[in-house]
Structure formats: C-alpha cells, structure tokens
C-alpha cells in the first residue's frame, strides 16, 4: 500500500529502487515492481534449463520452472517486531531448447497468470481489511515495465513512459 511520501520525482525514475512516479503515457508506476528483479530471476531459470529430463510420453525434454509473488506485512505485537509473508507460487514444466523469443513468451505468461492470482489473493477478505493493494493498476503495469526492461531489446520502457518531474 503506497503512501503520499512514496511519490518520487520523475527525474529519479531510472535510478531509484522504490517509490512512485507519474508518467505521461502510463500514469503511476511503482518503481519497486518496475525494477524487474523477479523477471531477471525467471529469465536466468529459463536460460539455465536446470534438471532437464526426457519424457517418453511427450518425446521431448522438459525442465521445471517456478515463479512466485509475495508480500510482507510488518507489525509490532507485544513489543516484538514481526513480519508476516504470504504469496502465490506457480510451478510449470517448460520444453527445453526454446528460442529466446519463446522463452520470453513463457515468462510473460507465467508472470501474468501468477500476478492475477496474487492480486486476487491480496484482494481476498483475509487481507483487504488491512491493505488496499489488491488489483492495483500501477502494480500490474509496473510489473510489465519490469518484464520489458529485462526481456525487451529496445530503449528502457520506463523512459518511454515519460516520467514527469514536479520541480
């Protein structure tokens, strides 16, 4: 859940690791999501193809890939700082030796499906009394920016979104 003091000047959009910036093209962007760290980890897993196994029934090689999204809530209970984590985990089998383009498609599908489940989980009755971040538009758009910053080949999508400066 973002707060007013999370708003960051657009001139720092590509250098800060957290905060919110407003862009001309896409509206609010959450810089934490737009870093693409989860996409970077997923890309590495897809490139490495660890534990590839031949499956007779499919006449091909496959390897396991997992992806997750999580949130943490920090609370002080009886004077003790506690952090509670929850999230959504997805595991799939991916055919080995796919082209980089097909691996990017697999990654986007995996990230999008997991993000939808995670945002629904955040929006469930268990959490919506505490946080209003379920199906937060800036989170989903920011996840896409993070994806294209890692898997894309052109200019930085965050710069293409035209972050605004308030100075």
Each predicted region: which residue ranges?
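Bulky hydrophobic segments
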Residues: 1-132, 150-167
């Amino acid at each position: 859940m973002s707060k007013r003091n999370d708003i960051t000047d657009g001139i720092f959009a590509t250098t800060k690791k957290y905060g919110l910036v407003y862009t001309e093209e896409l509206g609010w962007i959450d810089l934490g999501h737009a870093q693409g760290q989860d996409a970077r980890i997923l890309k590495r897993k897809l490139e490495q193809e660890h534990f590839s196994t031949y499956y007779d029934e499919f006449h091909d090689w496959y390897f396991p890939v997992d992806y997750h999204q999580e949130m943490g809530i920090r609370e002080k209970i009886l004077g003790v700082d506690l952090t509670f984590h929850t999230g959504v985990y997805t595991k799939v089998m991916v055919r080995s030796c796919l082209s980089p383009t097909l691996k990017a498609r697999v990654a986007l599908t995996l990230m999008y499906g997991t993000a939808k489940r995670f945002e629904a989980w955040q929006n469930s009755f268990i959490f919506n009394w505490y946080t209003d971040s379920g199906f937060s538009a800036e989170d989903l758009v920011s996840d896409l920016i993070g994806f294209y910053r890692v898997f894309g080949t052109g200019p930085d999508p965050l710069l293409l979104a035209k972050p605004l400066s308030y100075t």
